[in-house]
Amino acid sequence: CNAAAALVELLAKAYTSTEIGAICDFIDIALGNETDGCSLGLKTHCSISGDLTVNLGYIHIEGNEARAAFDIRYPVSITGGSVYRQFRYAAKHNKLDVKVLNHEKPLYIQKDSELVKLLSSAYKAVTGEEPELYTTGGGTYARKLGGKGLAFGPAFKDDEVNMHNADESIDKEKFFTHAQICLEAMYRMYCGISDNEN
């Protein structure tokens, strides 16, 4: 739950659905504190790329006009069209119009791709350990690379996840290790070294 959704929840407790308006009523009922899209009928798990996530990006109310933006990140096992149709169906009960402001397909690159193998070998060359590969729903720069790149690091085994938190940070030694891994990966890319060569 983010600040905007928490504010709507507070308003919904203090006022009736008629008083807060259709959009706030919809947000309170269909989103509330959820991030998995369950109440919207969107909850989806994908063993390859993880769960669908939803959050309220912003809400703007001025006079009789109200707008809200939702950030929905869906797994590779479903389509943006199916997400849009279900969201529109859920919003129709509150007589709300829905339009897509921006759409980016989820990014997924197979673990056995040459790029992933090369990056994994760079990680192993520096750390001496096999990397733990995983996907996230993050809206990273890698999406802009058209499937020819991916986000790479700097999370290590047993790290506490504090991404986007107030105390987001990285240990200095791990930062330098990550820099070494990136340099090794760039060197391997430049020299055309495959994952089998050391």
Enumerate the language-model features and the residues they cover.
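Short amphipathic alpha-helices in soluble, non-transmembrane regions
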Residues: 1, 10-14, 82-92
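Conserved active-site and cofactor/substrate-binding residues in soluble primary-metabolism enzymes
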Residues: 1-9, 51, 78, 82, ...
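Midchain, well-structured core segments that form catalytic/ion-binding scaffolds
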Residues: 1-77
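A short linear hydrophobic-aromatic micro-motif
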Residues: 55-57, 97, 129-135
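Active-site proximal loops enriched in glycine and acidic residues that flank catalytic Cys/His/Asp
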Residues: 58, 70-74, 100-102, 135, ...
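Zn-dependent metallopeptidase/amidohydrolase metal-coordination segment
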Residues: 62, 120-122, 129-192
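A common structural junction motif
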Residues: 89-96, 189
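Short proline/glycine- and acidic-rich turn/helix-capping motifs at secondary-structure junctions
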Residues: 100-112
